[in-house]
From Swiss-Prot:
Keywords: Bacterial flagellum biogenesis, Cytoplasm, Repressor, RNA-binding, Translation regulation. It comes from Ruminiclostridium cellulolyticum (strain ATCC 35319 / DSM 5812 / JCM 6584 / H10). Homodimer; the beta-strands of each monomer intercalate to form a hydrophobic core, while the alpha-helices form wings that extend away from the core. GO terms for biological process: bacterial-type flagellum organization; mRNA catabolic process; negative regulation of translational initiation; regulation of bacterial-type flagellum assembly; regulation of carbohydrate metabolic process. One of its GO terms (cellular component) is cytosol. This is Translational regulator CsrA. Belongs to the CsrA/RsmA family. HAMAP family: CsrA. The keyword DNA damage does not apply. The gene is csrA. The keyword Cytoplasm applies. GO terms for molecular function: mRNA 5'-UTR binding.
Amino acid sequence: MLVLSRKKDQSLMIGNDIELTIIDIQGDQVKIGLKAPKNVSIYRKELYLEIQEENKKAATADVVELDSIFKK
């Protein structure tokens, strides 16, 4: 993991088209601004992990249940 120090209003670039800016620092909370192309999905990690888990559940759907749905 690369660890960088930034102060309020300082930025860093990820690749050529993603800019991360430190907006505010209050105690142990840091507000971050992101500029990225619209085709780049940005999620908080905890939400991203939930999405992955739901996708795994959907991919392992009960075959018997699916078969009964399609026979209707």
